[in-house]
């Protein structure tokens, strides 16, 4: 549903006692209650720009009064900062004090005046009927993302993501078969891209994010080139759309699983993809 009613943004706003200003104030209060009402927190996959850095896992614990704790797969420390929900051309969530979990992708750096094309401010979209997911739209990137209610503690969740990330960071996956094609894959952890070489074709990069289950392909069903559908979809490998590669702990080590369940060894590579980790 759109926010908490059938009214979205400024369409068909009620009148009288529920005139627009009061309506929006009530909606902002409901969103605040929703965010602060889950002690475990909320998880987000941050999607900068055109997914050139893949997706970054961040978990938040929102508190009454505007305090927020942020846990990022990039950072070892917990970030304590503040947030605010306000109205400007839609109800927005902004992280209004320094927050390195978001800022490292949103703040200008050196010659990159646009930063890494990430967001620290978002417009609220739809809230699911069960109130377990909240759509966010990046104010800068315009990318659609999801806040998802956590069923476990935020720090515990991020630590599990880190375990998966560390297991495959800068590693190659043994040759396997997907969609009837022989496939070689390597994980570029720093920029969160999966290098995929199908048969004799040139390698290509697929944007990914890590999860507690493995490697997730971002925008698997999107066209590689919107102007040329013949190039196929982002996750297209032979007859199959690659959406996920599961990563499973096996004693003290890990292995991957193909979409068909085939076991794939995780191997060291001839190149150090982990430089500047």
Residues of each region from the PLM?
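Long, acidic/polar, low-complexity amphipathic helices and coiled-coil-like
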Residues: 67-192
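Acidic/polar, low-complexity intrinsically disordered N-terminal segments immediately downstream
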Residues: 8-92, 156-171
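N-terminal accessory/assembly segment that mediates macromolecular interactions
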Residues: 61, 67-123, 203-261
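Preference for solvent-exposed, low-hydrophobicity sequence contexts
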Residues: 150-277
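Short linear motifs in intrinsically disordered
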Residues: 30-34, 57-62, 121-127, 184-185, ...
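C-terminal motif of bacterial Sec signal peptides marking the signal peptidase cleavage site
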Residues: 3-6
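Acidic-enriched, low-complexity/disordered segments with a strong bias for Aspartate over Glutamate
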Residues: 11, 15-18, 33, 54, ...
């Amino acid at each position: 549903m759109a926010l908490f009613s059938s009214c979205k943004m400024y369409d068909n706003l009620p009148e009288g006692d529920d005139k627009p200003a009061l309506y929006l104030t009530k909606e902002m209060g409901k969103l605040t209650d929703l965010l602060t009402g889950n002690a475990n927190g909320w998880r987000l996959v941050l999607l900068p720009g055109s997914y050139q850095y893949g997706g970054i896992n961040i978990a938040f614990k929102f508190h009454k009064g505007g305090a927020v704790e942020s846990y990022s797969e990039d950072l070892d420390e917990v970030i304590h900062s503040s947030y605010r929900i306000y109205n400007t051309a839609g109800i927005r969530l902004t992280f209004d004090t320094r927050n390195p979990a978001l800022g490292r992708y949103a703040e200008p750096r050196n010659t990159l005046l646009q930063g890494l094309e990430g967001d620290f401010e978002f417009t609220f979209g739809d809230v699911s009927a069960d109130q377990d997911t909240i759509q966010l739209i990046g104010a800068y990137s315009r990318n659609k993302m999801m806040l998802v209610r956590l069923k476990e503690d935020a720090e515990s969740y991020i630590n599990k993501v880190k375990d998966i990330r560390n297991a495959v960071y800068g590693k190659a996956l043994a040759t396997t078969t997907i969609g009837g094609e022989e496939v070689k894959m390597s994980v570029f952890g720093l920029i969160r891209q999966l290098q995929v070489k199908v048969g004799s074709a040139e390698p290509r990069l697929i944007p990914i994010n890590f999860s507690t289950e493995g490697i997730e392909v971002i925008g698997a069903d999107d066209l590689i080139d919107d102007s040329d559908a013949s190039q196929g979809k982002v996750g297209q490998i032979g007859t199959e759309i690659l959406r996920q590669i599961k990563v499973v702990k096996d004693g003290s080590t890990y292995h991957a699983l193909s979409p068909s369940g085939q076991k794939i060894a995780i191997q060291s590579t001839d190149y150090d993809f982990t430089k500047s980790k």
